[in-house]
Amino acid sequence: MSPFSLLILVICAFSLFFLINLTRGLSILLVFSKNQLLALLLLSIVSLFSISLISALIFFDLLPSTFFGFILLFFF
């Protein structure tokens, strides 16, 4: 495993941990809030942003190895 892959894995793990804690806090806010629609919107935005960030990090980690594999496939 390359150091870059390890870094991506650590970032994804901490992002997931942060997302779980933030979701727990926002769900408590949703229960006690008078404006539940705003709290639900915040929860949705944070969840989508975190999932897209993790997906982008995984994609950019796998992209160079996939590109290198295609180069090897076409030239050798």
Curated annotation (Swiss-Prot):
It is a single-pass type I membrane protein. The chain crosses the membrane at residues 35-55. Residues 56-76 are cytoplasmic. Its main location: membrane. It comes from the Eukaryota. It is found in: Membrane. This is KANTR integral membrane protein. It comes from Homo sapiens (Human). The lineage of its organism: Eukaryota, Metazoa, Chordata, Craniata, Vertebrata. The gene is KANTR.
